[in-house]
Regions:
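Mature catalytic core of soluble alpha/beta enzymes
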Residues: 1-282
């Protein structure tokens, strides 16, 4: 019963916000880029509004208009030379959350530039995890854990009355779990580049691309963000990955109720102020 409810909710949201389903409201917004504003449901409007707030917070390191990017980097081994600087610059010309125009009164979204596109992948999975939890809680599911491709939201306790736990791995050390954290009515999202990357001149370029420059993020192999809402953890993990270790930690340390663990490309582990990593390390 709960599984059916969860699946129905996932489908409902996908049919609202997926940019790869041509009939969704987000696809309609994308089709009308540079042409006209599109009225959307309040749910879609508010999600986009929150996404823009995270763009402001991360100074554009997280940006839902990243879907406008030309896919010039290939991470399947087929790319033998680095793209040119001109191509890289051109690839991000249409990205920019400041060109997403929201009109609260009409509840419309307008993309200023023709060819601009929204993609809610970096926040949508977290949003789905939160909404599934809400649906299950409302229908009497007093404890559970939802995992939407790595975005995890847990509430209540396991059947043995112990809290749910999540293991954090170090990708640079044979994916060994180095710390286990209890998840008590909270969520975690891990973003990693250890599966998809290319190396040029000894620099490891990850598949997570900085929407501001068009260059892949470097310096980090994994980011785990803990927050009450999976949506926030999801978007911030991407943003921190792009911002890098110092700026990323600095940002998280200013945010209430949010913590993170970063593994850099040397395998070193960094954590935000509120996490005493020694307490949870194996």
């Amino acid at each position: 019963y709960f599984t059916d409810l969860a699946i129905a909710e996932v489908k409902r949201i996908e049919n609202l916000i997926s940019d790869w389903i041509p009939t969704t409201q987000i696809s309609l917004v994308n089709k009308n880029a540079g042409i006209q504003a599109v009225r959307v449901d309040s749910e879609v409007y508010e999600l986009v509004e929150r996404a823009i707030k995270i763009s402001q917070l991360t100074e554009g390191a997280f940006d839902i208009s990243y879907a406008s990017m030309d896919k010039i980097w290939k991470f399947d081994g087929s790319m033998t030379v680095m793209p040119t600087e001109v191509a890289i610059k051109k690839s991000v010309a249409k990205i920019g959350y400041k060109n997403i125009i929201l009109n609260k009164e009409d509840q419309t979204i307008f993309l200023k530039l023709e060819g601009m596109k929204l993609g809610l992948g970096g926040i949508g999975q977290g949003y789905i995890a939160d909404k599934v939890k809400t649906v299950l809680l409302t229908n009497g599911c007093s404890s559970g854990i939802v995992n939407v491709s790595g975005d995890i939201n847990a509430w209540g306790k396991q059947s043995n009355q112990k809290p749910w736990t999540v293991g954090i791995v170090n990708p640079m050390n044979k994916n060994k779990v180095f710390a286990t954290f209890p998840l008590e009515n909270s969520s975690v999202e891990t973003s990693g580049n250890y599966e998809k990357y290319v190396i040029f001149n000894g620099i490891r370029y990850s598949h997570i691309i900085d929407p501001r420059t068009g260059y892949p993020a470097t310096g980090i192999v994994s980011v785990s963000v803990f927050a009450k809402q999976t949506e926030i953890a999801d978007a911030l993990a991407t943003g921190i990955f792009v911002l890098g270790v110092e700026v990323g930690l600095d940002l998280v340390n200013q945010l209430k109720g949010i913590e993170c663990i970063i593994v850099d490309d040397k395998g070193k582990i960094h954590s935000s102020k509120g996490i005493d990593i020694k307490k949870y390390t194996k």
